[in-house]
Curated annotation (Swiss-Prot):
Gene3D superfamilies: Nucleoside phosphorylase domain. Coiled coil: none annotated. One of its GO terms (biological process) is purine nucleoside catabolic process. This is Purine nucleoside phosphorylase DeoD-type. The active site is at D205. It comes from Escherichia coli O127:H6 (strain E2348/69 / EPEC). Pfam families: PNP_UDP_1. Catalyzes the reversible phosphorolytic breakdown of the N-glycosidic bond in the beta-(deoxy)ribonucleoside molecules, with the formation of the corresponding free purine bases and pentose-1-phosphate.
Amino acid sequence: MATPHINAEMGDFADVVLMPGDPLRAKYIAETFLEDAREVNNVRGMLGFTGTYKGRKISVMGHGMGIPSCSIYTKELITDFGVKKIIRVGSCGAVLPHVKLRDVVIGMGACTDSKVNRIRFKDHDFAAIADFDMVRNAVDAAKALGVDARVGNLFSADLFYSPDGEMFDVMEKYGILGVEMEAAGIYGVAAEFGAKALTICTVSDHIRTHEQTTAAERQTTFNDMIKIALESVLLGDKE
C-alpha cells in the first residue's frame, strides 16, 4: 500500500529500481529506454515509472539530493514494495587528474562525512560497500558495451558547497574516484534492510579543472551509464 512518500501499490514496482537523483532524469530514462512505461509515483514530484527493458520488468524513480532524501525513498521501496536491488545512476565530481569529464565510475565503496551510518551502526564505522555480484555484472556490462568504466571508492558528501577545500587534497591522496551525495547512505539502507545496492556515476564536473557539463547534458547525455545499469540487471538474472 502507499507510504507517506510513494503513492503506489504492491506490485507496481519491479524488484530492481534504477534511481537517479533528478525525477526528470527518471522520466527521461523511462521514456528513452523502457517499453510500456507507466507512472507509478508522483508524490512531491518525485516521479517513478515501471516498464520493461528487453522484456525484463524494471522500475526507475528519482531519489532527490543527499543522504536523508535517498534514505527515505530507498527504505520505503525495500520494506513496503519488495524491492530487492537498487542501482543509483547519477553524477559525480572528480578530483583525480586522470579522471575525465563523462567518465563512468562504478562505486565499489563509499566514504562519507555524514553521520547517518554511524547512527545506524551504534556509533561505529560501517563499511559502506556495493553488492559484489552487482559490481561484477556492471563491470562485465561496461566491457560488453565498450565502455572503459572505472571501479573504486566514491565520497558521499553532506555539503554540496563545501567550505573545506583541503578535503579535496585528502580525497586525491586516497584515490577517491568521484564525489557525490548519496551512495554511502544507499549502501547503508540496503545493508540494514537486507537488499542489494550499487552506484554508477558519470563525471559531470572536475573540481580541479572547473570543467563541467550543462544541466541539460546531465539529464539527457549520460546514456552509457544507463545502458550499463540496465544490461547489468540482465546479467544478474542469468546467475
